[in-house]
Amino acid sequence: QEFIITARDLKQQKVFRESTIRSLFDEILRGLRIVHQHKMLHLDIKPANIFITDDNRSVLIDFGAAREVLSKEGNFIRPMYTPGFAAPEMYRRDAAMGPWTDIYAIGACIYACMQGYPPNEAPQRLEKDRIAIALSRLRGIYSDNLIEVVEWCMALDPLSRPQSVFALQKELSRESERRYTKLTMGEKVRLQFDTMVADTKKSVKGMPGLGTRQR
């Protein structure tokens, strides 16, 4: 999974400060709110589709999967989706999609900015959800408010998520929260180490003859 693109073509640190996350996604949500006001859904929000300009403004790109909201007749073509950032309802033919579907992806993007890697795919979460446990390890690094916002956005039940971009914007812009959390070197090393271990486990599991005990 490619990470957030920058106009300078520089590799950004995988882990973002809370103040940076709030600032970036405030701008992204402004653009997404306009999309939703035109009765459209993006449906492919992911870090690779977030472009950061030279003056550090964030822009949502690639509307190739964008579709109109369900009509009264229910005619709707299911778009392609990106595992980890696609909401559970995108995997089901009979599920209604709406602003809450894009909001799930926003939460997944914020999660990726905090952890340095994407969350588990929705079907995996439906079997065994580890999101809350993973986020709990970030308490003290990020504010409780930001962690709760991500959990809210990534609720498996669409009705348990913010139902509009405005509701999410309001919560994400709360001035009373600790917005300038800085990661210490030790915290950065720990997060990067955790990522390396997770990637190694995935690589070993995928190698023939490894990851399972031979008899």
Residue ranges and their predicted role:
Residues N75-M90:
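Conserved activation segment of eukaryotic-like protein kinases, specifically the C-terminal portion
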Residues I28-M40:
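Protein kinase catalytic-loop region centered on the HRD/HxD motif
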Residues I141-L156:
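Conserved C-terminal C-lobe helix
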Residues R161:
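Conserved HRD-motif arginine in the catalytic loop of eukaryotic-like protein kinases
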Residues L24-F25:
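Activation segment signature within eukaryotic-like protein kinase domains
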Residues E89-W100:
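Conserved end of the kinase activation segment
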